[in-house]
């Protein structure tokens, strides 16, 4: 008869081979977080920038089937449970989506934009300095304490498309 240790090892191997063990661990972590999370303590209000960033991350996580990670992000950040409208995100980010396949996360299109690099002779300001705060204030800047009138500068460069990163699109198509 097999020992308890041997049975545990066989069970663990079986769950790993089926791809279930990782999902179980993620689900347990999410449930533990939800149990420990104090709903009575109000979350700080999200800045406009954080709302957009969190939504891009949520879209990416859900696309890649990281649903438990996404649930923790929503709970921990105070992001609305109902996702923001994709067209709203595109307008707010000044992005352009040429692809008819709107299932690919906008984050992939943004990545494609930066991998292309700036037009010849132009400096990419978004990568050389922060648009959220001046360089002299970087030590004291706190995202949750920015004034309401502090906004992300709109980039007037070329618009982002999701079709310009075929390698990423192929890598994520399942």
UniProtKB/Swiss-Prot annotation:
Coiled coil feature spans: none
Start-end of Basic and acidic residues biased regions: 145-157
Role this protein plays: Involved in the biogenesis of cilia. Required for the recruitment of PLK1 to centrosomes and S phase progression.
Identification of the protein by name: Centrosomal protein 20
A Pfam family annotated for this UniProt entry: FOP_dimer
The UniProt record lists the keyword Flavoprotein: no
Keywords: Cell projection, Cilium biogenesis/degradation, Cytoplasm, Cytoskeleton, Phosphoprotein
Chain segments carrying region Necessary and sufficient for homooligomerization and localization to centrosomes and pericentriolar satellites: 1-104
Primary gene name: Cep20
GO MF assignments: identical protein binding
Source domain of life: Eukaryota
Phosphoserine modifications at: 144
Family the entry assigns: Belongs to the CEP43 family.
The protein's assembly and partners: Homooligomer; probably required for localization to centrosomes. Forms a complex with KIAA0753/OFIP and OFD1; within this complex may stabilize the interaction between OFD1 and KIAA0753/OFIP. Interacts with PCM1; this interaction may be mediated by KIAA0753/OFIP.
Transmembrane segments: none
GO biological process: cilium assembly; microtubule anchoring
A single Gene Ontology CC term: ciliary basal body
């Amino acid at each position: 008869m097999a020992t308890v240790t041997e049975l545990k090892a066989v069970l663990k191997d079986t769950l790993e081979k089926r791809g279930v063990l990782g999902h179980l661990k993620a689900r347990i972590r999410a449930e533990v977080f939800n149990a420990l999370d104090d709903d009575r303590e109000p979350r700080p209000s999200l800045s406009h920038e954080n709302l957009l960033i969190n939504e891009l991350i949520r879209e990416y996580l859900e696309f890649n089937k990281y649903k438990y990670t996404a649930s923790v992000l929503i709970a921990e950040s105070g992001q609305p449970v109902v996702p923001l409208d994709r067209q709203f995100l595109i307008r707010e980010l000044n992005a352009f989506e040429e692809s008819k396949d709107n299932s690919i996360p906008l984050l992939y299109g943004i990545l494609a934009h930066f991998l292309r690099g700036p037009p010849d002779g132009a400096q990419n300001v978004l990568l050389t300095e922060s648009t959220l705060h001046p360089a002299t204030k970087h030590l004291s800047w706190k995202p949750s304490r920015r004034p309401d009138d502090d906004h992300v500068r709109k980039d007037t460069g070329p618009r982002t498309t999701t079709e310009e990163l075929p390698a990423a699109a192929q890598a994520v198509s399942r």
